[in-house]
Amino acid sequence: MIRLTQYLQSGVKPALGCTEPGAIAFAVSRACKDLPEDEILESIEVKTSINIYKNGMYVVIPGTNGARGNKIAAALGAICGDPSLKLRALKSCNDSHIEKAKRMIASGKVKLSCLRDKPGVYIDVTVKTRNHAARCVIDGDHTAISLVARDGVIVFKGSQREREEPVFFEGEKFPIDEIIETVERIDAKDVDFIFEGVKMNLEIATYAMNEGISLCKPVKENNNSEEELAIRIKRFCAAASFARMAGVPLPVMSSGGSGNQGIVTILPVAITGKSYGKTREEIAKAIALSHLVLGYIKSRLGKVTPTCGAANAAGPAAAAGIVYMLNGSTEQISQAMSTVFSSTLGMICDGAKEACAYKVGFSGEVAYNSAMLALDKSCVAGPQGVVGKTIEETIENIREISTRTALELENTIIDILEKYNK
């Protein structure tokens, strides 16, 4: 049986701002820890995989008054980063740190390059003073340090086993019966932890709507029709994502290494559960199922892909959670997931930025609508298009498309983004 507590500890974590620049700040701060505090930093060199490079290019760093990108994350990691906080390493950032970071970048001390042949999550940082140099490498996961060295001498080396995430899902088969059995045995501590995520993600969405941030408008709570509930889910998801991408200094609960995935995995299920009068434990079980289904999908498609994870992983997962919570069958869970996939397949990832909010909002809405369709015995039945005869076939078809097109698609996106980032 899947160990729910272990999965939640591994795959569901608070994150401040976008995950990728947070990981860069963490890596730089960890490298700087091995340099003498009394020596002036002369240079920071950051090399990243294509996914890290892309996702951090335009996103706002929380607490920086609108400063964007991987370079500012790297500079701040050196100036005020706390490696013990990992993805929240920049929690203590203030105006004086920001100005110092901008001067560091303007002086040419921060170099950033993209390793276009490097897949997945990879960050290689070297920081130098006049007399010393330190290096930190992250590989495989946003907080998985594989190596730390000072002056060429390795001071820490993570084993492959330490760096690899625990394996919870193996093979193509969708283990929905095992997932349901797992969440049915949920304990009180896991319920509390899941509701920490609900509170966190509702809080940032509510903040955005109360402050009137861009597209974030207040949502009326007095209409529980299906149409209005779908709109409410869409707005809450979009507001949480927009605030996060715009640098609001509030954390979100991530899922599968992504804050936007966490928003879609959690909020549609939580909002639906509240509207339908479900108990705290019933909602927690459904969100736990949503997290686990996301984990299964990501195990097949990959942690970072050229397609949008909020749409093509979290959306189907949330639909599964809603169907389960409203007493649907395992067949209806698979049907709801297939309907989401048929709606979201063409949604690519062109980097993290405020516009992601529209994708995240749409993903939450289509998750709810697909769940309602499945419960009403309606779905996109396969085979048609990429939707196969089974949910496993559908996911395998999407994996094949993603794998075959990944390198060319990612490089094309980077070429386009770099035109505007010179």
UniProtKB/Swiss-Prot annotation:
Q: Name one Pfam family in it.
A: SDH_alpha
Q: Which residues form the signal peptide?
A: none
GO annotation, biological process: L-cysteine catabolic process to pyruvate
Top-level taxon in the UniProt lineage: Bacteria
Q: Which residues cross the membrane?
A: none
Which GO terms label this protein's molecular function in UniProt?
A: L-cysteine desulfhydrase activity
UniProt xrefs under HAMAP family? UPF0597 (MF_01845)
Q: Which family, according to the similarity comment?
A: Belongs to the UPF0597 family.
The protein's name is: UPF0597 protein Kole_0595
Q: Which organism is it from?
A: Kosmotoga olearia (strain ATCC BAA-1733 / DSM 21960 / TBF 19.5.1)
